[in-house]
Every structure is written in structure tokens, then in C-alpha cells.
């Protein structure tokens, strides 16, 4: 499973305390590698540290340590709270204040889990950093390629689009060809107590799923009231802060109208939430920024037919991308898509291969 024939290689496993990374550690120990487990303490929000479906907090650190003891491997806990707050939590909060829908898991993988943890692994003399993500690393003609996991229900490639070529060289993902059931069976085989542990939540640092409390704690003036306008220009009511809204939202708008209304646009500068009929959510094209490209090079103006995902839970859609100046791309759907939200990621695929991706901007053109 690991691209190394040297059983004397030292491999660092990023251990969250969950079943996936624990099984990775078990696989590598069984194969005879020198394995070091590292768990990152990322936050401490009271209730969240004791939740069974959180990650990288109190109970999970204990679980990771117990797994390491069971497997007879060294294990270290690193305090990354300040790095995590700076790179992930602050970005999450500020994204909502910009009227965006943030994606903290990508930011965490991009910065803390890969950039910072790879640096630590190299300082320990490790040959690879190995994680429990459900993606595949396949050696292509021009180097390693990032591919979807074989299990479509667990594929995590959308969340790893920002992985750089250099990071991909150093990473390995042994679970990419497995299903979750197969992973749990391996956990039972290794005698790991986490075999039946529930999966972690998407936003690990938000207690009880109430992200607004996190935002208001860090930015006390975040919930500033403002107008709710119909896209045709007339006022329908007031809101208690743009952080309470996301593109495509229908429920909880706090207004009444003779037809269902959806959030179409959020303007942070004027503090206005625009609503309209479902048809107004249709998008034909948009621009992405901070593009990470893993497949060769593209010239400005060059076009390519691909498939793209604009939400992790949506299937890929056929689209045409064209390279813009700098690190931006234009994405044009071959058939319109709904509710393309600024702040989310657009991940670009060729079949199962991740070609790259970027962050959706406000440059969204309705259908």
C-alpha cells in the first residue's frame, strides 16, 4: 500500500484518534515499518473536547495514545492550537463576515495537517507522512496523481484539492482502495477499541454545531442587523447578521412571501441579504481564485473540458475551464448548476483524477 520497498523506512502517521488513522497505523506496523504516531491538539472548547464525534481534542487524543500503546509504537501529541486558530478558525470566522460559506476542512488539510505536519515529520527524519484519508495516490507518467477514493460514499478528494505537488510526493493514503466497512474490520482484526467509534463531524471545533457562537466569541460585533431585499429591489424585512445566511438557504429567513424564497446573494459591504425564487439560483459560469493545479501547466486563455464539483456532497458536473491571468480560472457549466456559493471550493476532475481546484469568488454569472 505504501510506495516504499524499504521496510526500514520511518513513517509518520497523522493520528486523529478515529478508526481510519488508527487502522493506517495498524497496517504499517503489521508491514514492519518504523511507525511514529503524531496527534495534533487543535482546539479546546470545553464541551467539544469530550464529544465522541469530534476530532483532535481531549477524548480523541486519549484514544490515539491507547491505539499507539496497543500497537507498540511511539506517539507524540503536539500543541497546534495557536496555528489552528490562526490558519483555520480565524479564516472560518472572517469568511462568514465576508458573506461567504467557508470550508474549514480544506484550510486545515492545506495548512496545519499538511504544511505544518509535513515539516514536523521531516524534522523527525520520516520518509513519508501517512494519513487516513479516503483518496488514492497513483504514479502517473509525470509523477504522482491524486485520485478519488474507490468508495464513492467515503471519497475525500474534494477536501484535498489544495494539496501541492511537493506535498503529494511526501504523502501516502493506504485507505484509498478500501470501504469503511473494510476499515472497521481491520480495526477489529488489530484489536483496536476504536473499531466502532463514530466518524468525526465536518466542523470539529464547533460545539453542538452552533458555529454562530464561535463567530460571536471571536468577533463580538459579527451579528449586525441589516436589510433583506428581494432581487427585484423591494424590502422584505431585516436580518440579525449575514453570518446567519448562506447561498441557497430557504429555511429560517425570517420573512413571509407568496412564494418560496432563497438566499441568492450576500453583500457584506452594504450588509444586505438578497433573496429570490429558486430559478435565480441557477448559475452558468463563475471565477475561482488561488488555483492549485496538479496536472502539468495551462497557458492563459487555454480551455479544457473537465468535470467539476462545487460542493462535497454533489456529483461532478461537466464544465469548461479557461485559464485567466495569475492564479484564476473561469468555469463554465455545460448545463446550469444551482447555488454556487462564494467561499466554497470548485474541484476539477478528469475522471477520478483531481486536476486541481480553487476558491469560488463573487464573480458568479447567473444562467
Swiss-Prot record:
For the ligand (ATP), the binding residues are 14-21, 40, 132
Q: Which GO terms describe its biological process?
A: tRNA wobble position uridine thiolation
State its role: Catalyzes the 2-thiolation of uridine at the wobble position (U34) of tRNA, leading to the formation of s(2)U34.
Give the reactions, separated by semicolons, that this protein catalyses: S-sulfanyl-L-cysteinyl-[protein] + uridine(34) in tRNA + AH2 + ATP = 2-thiouridine(34) in tRNA + L-cysteinyl-[protein] + A + AMP + diphosphate + H(+)
Q: Extract the GO molecular function terms from the UniProt entry.
A: ATP binding; tRNA binding; tRNA-uridine 2-sulfurtransferase activity
Species of origin reads Rickettsia bellii (strain OSU 85-389)
Q: Where is this region: Interaction with tRNA?
A: 154-156
The intrachain disulfides are 108-204
Annotated family = Belongs to the MnmA/TRMU family.
Any idea which UniProt keywords this protein has? ATP-binding, Cytoplasm, Disulfide bond, Nucleotide-binding, RNA-binding, Transferase, tRNA processing, tRNA-binding
Localization, per the record, is: Cytoplasm
Q: What is its EC number?
A: 2.8.1.13
The site (Interaction with tRNA) lies at 133, 344
What's the superkingdom here? Bacteria
**UniProt-recorded name of the protein:** tRNA-specific 2-thiouridylase MnmA
Main localization, broad class = cytoplasm
Q: Name one Pfam family in it.
A: tRNA_Me_trans_C
Q: Which GO terms describe its cellular component?
A: cytoplasm
List, from the UniProt record, the residues annotated as the active site of this protein: 108 (nucleophile), 204 (cysteine persulfide intermediate)
InterPro entries cross-referenced by the UniProt entry:
MnmA-like, MnmA-like_C, MnmA-like_central, MnmA-like_central_sf, Rossmann-like_a/b/a_fold
EC primary class:
transferase
Amino acid at each position: 500500500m505504501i510506495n516504499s520497498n524499504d521496510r526500514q523506512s520511518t513513517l509518520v502517521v497523522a493520528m486523529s484518534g478515529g478508526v481510519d488513522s488508527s487502522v493506517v497505523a495498524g497496517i504499517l506496523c503489521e508491514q514492519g515499518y518504523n511507525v511514529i504516531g503524531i496527534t495534533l491538539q487543535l482546539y479546546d472548547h470545553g464541551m467539544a473536547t469530550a464529544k465522541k464525534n469530534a476530532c483532535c481534542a481531549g477524548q480523541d487524543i486519549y484514544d490515539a495514545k491507547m491505539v499507539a500503546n496497543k500497537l507498540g509504537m511511539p506517539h507524540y501529541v503536539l500543541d497546534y492550537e495557536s496555528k489552528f486558530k490562526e490558519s483555520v478558525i480565524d479564516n472560518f470566522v472572517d469568511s462568514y463576515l465576508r458573506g461567504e460559506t467557508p470550508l474549514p476542512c480544506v484550510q486545515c488539510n492545506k495548512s496545519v495537517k499538511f504544511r505544518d505536519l509535513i515539516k514536523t515529520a521531516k524534522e523527525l527524519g520520516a520518509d513519508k507522512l501517512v494519513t487516513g484519508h479516503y483518496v488514492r495516490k497513483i504514479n502517473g507518467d509525470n509523477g504522482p496523481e491524486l485520485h478519488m477514493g474507490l468508495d464513492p460514499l467515503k471519497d475525500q478528494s474534494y477536501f484535498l484539492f489544495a494539496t501541492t505537488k511537493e506535498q503529494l510526493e511526501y504523502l501516502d493514503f493506504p485507505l484509498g482502495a478500501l470501504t469503511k466497512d473494510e476499515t472497521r474490520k481491520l480495526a477489529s482484526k488489530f484489536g483496536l477499541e476504536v473499531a466502532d467509534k463514530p466518524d468525526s463531524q465536518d466542523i470539529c471545533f464547533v460545539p453542538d454545531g452552533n458555529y454562530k457562537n464561535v463567530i460571536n466569541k471571536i468577533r463580538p460585533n459579527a451579528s449586525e442587523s441589516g436589510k433583506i431585499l428581494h432581487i427585484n429591489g423591494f424590502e422584505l424585512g431585516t436580518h440579525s447578521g449575514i453570518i446567519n445566511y448562506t447561498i441557497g438557504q430557504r429555511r429560517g429567513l425570517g420573512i413571509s412571501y407568496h412564494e418560496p424564497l432563497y438566499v441568492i446573494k450576500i453583500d457584506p459591504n452594504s450588509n444586505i441579504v438578497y433573496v429570490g425564487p429558486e430559478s435565480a439560483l441557477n448559475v452558468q459560469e463563475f471565477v475561482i481564485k488561488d488555483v492549485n493545479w496538479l496536472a502539468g501547466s495551462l497557458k492563459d486563455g487555454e480551455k479544457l473540458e473537465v468535470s467539476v464539483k462545487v460542493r462535497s456532497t454533489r456529483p461532478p458536473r461537466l464544465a469548461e475551464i479557461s485559464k485567466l491571468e495569475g492564479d484564476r480560472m473561469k468555469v463554465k457549466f455545460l448545463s446550469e448548476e444551482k447555488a454556487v456559493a462564494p467561499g466554497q471550493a470548485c474541484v476539477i476532475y478528469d475522471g477520478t483524477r483531481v486536476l486541481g481546484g480553487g476558491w469560488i469568488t463573487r464573480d458568479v454569472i447567473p444562467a
